[in-house]
Amino acid sequence: MSAAKSVSIGIDLGTTYSCVGVFQHGKVEIIANDQGNRTTPSYVAFTDTERLIGDAAKNQVALNPSNTVFDAKRLIGRRFDEPVVQADMKHWPFKVVSEGGKPKIQVDYKGENKTFFPEEISSMVLVKMKEIAEAYLGHKVSNAVITVPAYFNDSQRQATKDAGVIAGLNVQRIINEPTAAAIAYGLDKGKSGERNVLIFDLGGGTFDVSILTIEDGIFEVKATAGDTHLGGEDFDNRMVNHFVEEFKRKHKKDISQNKRALRRLRTACERAKRTLSSSSQASIEIDSLFEGIDFYTSVTRARFEELCSDLFRGTLEPVEKALRDAKMDKGQIHDVVLVGGSTRIPKIQKLLQDFFNGRELNKSINPDEAVAYGAAVQAAILSGDTSGNVQDLLLLDVAPLSLGIETAGGVMTALIKRNTTIPTKQTQVFSTYADNQPGVLIQVYEGERAMTKDNNLLGKFDLTGIPPAPRGVPQIEVTFDIDANGILNVSAVDKSTGNENKITITNDKGRLSKEDIERMVQEAEKYKAEDEQQRDKIAAKNSLESLAFNLKSSAQDDSLKDKISQEDRKRVVEKCDETIAWLENNQLADKDEFQHKQKELEKVCNPIISKLYQGGMPSGSCREQARADSQGPTIEEVD
């Protein structure tokens, strides 16, 4: 591959699926992976011999549930003891452990016990997306824009950025998913005049609502709301629980502790859910689900809607909140745009349509690809692309949560109110609470509650060396500065001494240290090298295997009987049989051994086979006719 050009890609790093796009020749290309799919499962699997990412990982999940990791986005930037993490762990077949209060995923890889941070798993998915883009573009890529849910907090954003760094990417910007989708929508429409657009983005694991005003290429986010923990997987969970109960009733057996049975059931439920978006009934047929019992059943759309009714209805709350924050009436919204695969569910569309008094919803953009599309446009802008339709584009995003410090009595004093356009900088002067107080503790919080104990502590630092003075006299200037990625810097200055201290809100909470990240970057390289080694090994094995079978069939071909002596034929067949037998017993041999065996085989057979082809048949060694390097793992079909 040639050296990296300055092209930048847009990656939608999703909970369940990811997608990558690039802007070139004046338009966005959403790039298909090696399986021809334009979205790639955000799955990483570890086996005794290799690591699989994407479709290959998801395809073998029922065979290897406890070492196939997904949903890393539901863990990223969170702490182990958060209630949502504890609740999720009940649904996951893989093991999550705590290390220093942070969640780590535990798997068996190549016979060893390994633990990974969520950032590392996400970085593996990002590497896959990067490779998909590189295969399409034909050169290395290092610059990227990565999207996150608008409602992601500071530590979740920071952790996503870290995942990009571990994947060897220069993350130019972290942008909000609904904002990215709005760019896709706005470019697609190109209508003049001001339009108020509500983006309703319901994906596999997260839910966002954003209201934007689009006018002449300026995208201004007015308000954002959502739930970083609601999506298609929660609907799958409801269906899985329903069928676990049904299995108990019908067969008096509990499958809830059997990982493989649960995984097969979940896959069937996900498929049924998709079917129910276009049909009123879906059947589920799983052979030998548990203890040899076949599970044949069906589910109607009405029953599915009833199972998820509270979750579906709950999606309207953030819509109302966003409208309130944007100080808009629902009649002022010109377009309601659907993004994310879960918006295909008819009931969700109906609830939303009824909420907007029967208004037609806008389905003009592809719900699976819109976010990556917008990210690719933003990537092009940041890389200095001057194509007519993107150069005038300006993106004004907002901070999703209020940010402030704790003042006397545990009160939350907000310096930056939620839905403030970013980047932004706000300064406020505070003072001491007691006479001759020598220092102050600046504690930074995010959240909307009046008391800090109900909000989320992002970090804290001390400002010391304040000269003795009566309370209320010293002037301490606190500045909050949010950059375009939504990441916060806080500084405090004692105006009398010029003494300053500051913090980038990254250290305390869920954030990896620089050393950790560097170590993970090296490990990622190591894993990549191992993956390539494994691919080469499989290629060498397949090459040897196909050569042996092809030679054997050539030697036994009746039409070639006259051209080869009985003795020669016997030698070829025997050597091939010997090689095939060796292969069966040495599946895990090294690449060099396979190549050595291939040379041995060629040494015996080449002279004999070349006699065959002297009569005007294709020249060249038998190696050429046997080049069938089928790459990659063999995948078993799984229900």
Curated annotation (Swiss-Prot):
Does the keyword Nucleotide-binding belong to this entry? yes
Gene Ontology MF term list: ATP binding; ATP hydrolysis activity; ATP-dependent protein folding chaperone; heat shock protein binding; protein folding chaperone
GO annotations of cellular component type = cytoplasm; cytosol; nucleus; plasma membrane
Stretches for region Disordered? 616-639
Q: Name one GO biological process term.
A: protein refolding
Superkingdom of origin organism: Eukaryota
Q: Which InterPro entries does the entry link to?
A: ATPase_NBD, Heat_shock_70_CS, HSP70_C_sf, HSP70_peptide-bd_sf, Hsp_70_fam
Sorted alphabetically, the keyword list is: ATP-binding, Nucleotide-binding, Stress response
The Swiss-Prot or TrEMBL record describes its family as follows: Belongs to the heat shock protein 70 family.
Q: What is this protein called?
A: Heat shock 70 kDa protein 1
What organism is recorded for this protein?
Oryzias latipes
Phylogenetic lineage: Eukaryota, Metazoa, Chordata, Craniata, Vertebrata
